[in-house]
Amino acid sequence: MLSEILNFNREFVARKDYLPYQTTKYPDRKLAILTCMDTRLTHLLPAALGLRNGEVKMIKNAGGVVLAPYGGVVRSLLVAVLELGVEEILVIGHTDCGVCGMRPEVIRQHLLARGIAPEILSE
C-alpha cells in the first residue's frame, strides 16, 4: 500500500498536478471547521458547503469533539485564530456517527486483545 501511494505521489509531483491546489496557509474565508474524521465526509462536507481548497482550515478527529481544554483540537483552533486569521469556527457533526455508539469497555477489550498491558489502560 505505501509503495503504491509513494509511486503515485512521485508521478503527481513530476507531472506538476499540484499546481491547481497551490494556495497560501491563510484560509480565504477566515473560517475553521471542526468535524468528524468519517470518510464519508472527506469530499461531501466541502461540496455540501460550497467550499474550495484554501478557503478554510479543516480540523478532524473521531466524532468532531473537543475532549481536553489544552489538547490537539484546541491547539489547532488557537493557531488558526491567533496566527492564521480565522475569525469564525464551525463545529459540524453528522448523522450516523460511529463514535456516538462506541462503548469504552468494548474499546478497552479491543486494546487488550491487541496486547496493550492492562496497567497502561488504567492510567
Stretch-by-stretch model annotation:
Residues K25-R40:
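N-terminal low-complexity or amphipathic/hydrophobic leaders
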Residues L34-C36, K60, I92-H94:
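Short beta-strand segments
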Residues M37-R40, T95-V99:
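Gly/Ser/Thr-rich loops at beta-strand to alpha-helix junctions
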Residues T42-L45, C100-M102:
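Short glycine-/acidic-enriched loop or helix-start segments at secondary-structure transitions
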Residues P46-R52:
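Short Gly/aromatic-enriched secondary-structure transition segments
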Residues N53-G64:
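Glycine/charged-rich beta-loop-alpha catalytic/anionic-binding loops adjacent to active sites
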